[in-house]
Regions:
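Extended, low-polarity transmembrane helix blocks
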Residues: 2-45, 64-71, 75-153
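Membrane-interface interhelical connector segments
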Residues: 44-64
Length: 153
């Protein structure tokens, strides 16, 4: 039963999944693009409290940084989404948009982890922070995925 059952199960799963394989990266693209856009959209208009918080972390040019973070998140999210669509008509341009947007996500998330969430370790920290820190890591890893892979399926 063991090996034969596993082979049959694998064949069944392969049969079910194979029509959807070409769309699997679209699910990641939609999740990251929408999530990142919404993170930025929630910061606009830029609130003085956000600027003050950035300044309290020792960042010079806190007002400019707040603007760049908010708009960077929105534009990177849009770029992740439209990079795939543009890539259907002009593959090189779509690939560049996707990779640059993924790189922007990486830079923003590294900054967020180091600045905003530096006390939220994976195995220690405030109650509930482990889950939130993992969300930040997932966003960073998805950005890295698109920066490396681009639109290559």
């Amino acid at each position: 039963m063991g090996v034969n059952f596993m082979n049959k199960l694998n064949d069944l799963l392969e049969k079910l999944a194979s029509p959807l394989k070409d769309y699997s990266s679209c699910l990641l693209r939609i999740g990251l693009g929408v999530s990142f856009f919404l993170h930025g959209y929630g910061k606009v208009p830029i609130q003085q409290g956000f600027i003050d918080w950035l300044a309290s972390k020792g960042l010079p040019f806190a007002e400019l940084t707040a603007f760049l973070v908010a708009w960077g998140e929105m534009l990177a999210g849009i770029g992740i989404l439209i990079g795939g669509l543009v890539g259907l008509r002009t593959p090189v341009v779509g690939n560049i948009i996707t990779r640059l947007s993924g790189g922007a996500v990486m830079v923003i998330m590294i900054g967020a982890l180091l600045l905003a969430h530096s006390n939220w370790g994976i195995f220690f920290g405030e109650r509930g922070s482990i889950l939130f820190a993992s969300e930040q890591l997932f966003l960073l890893l998805l950005g890295t995925y698109f920066a490396i892979k681009g639109n290559d399926h």
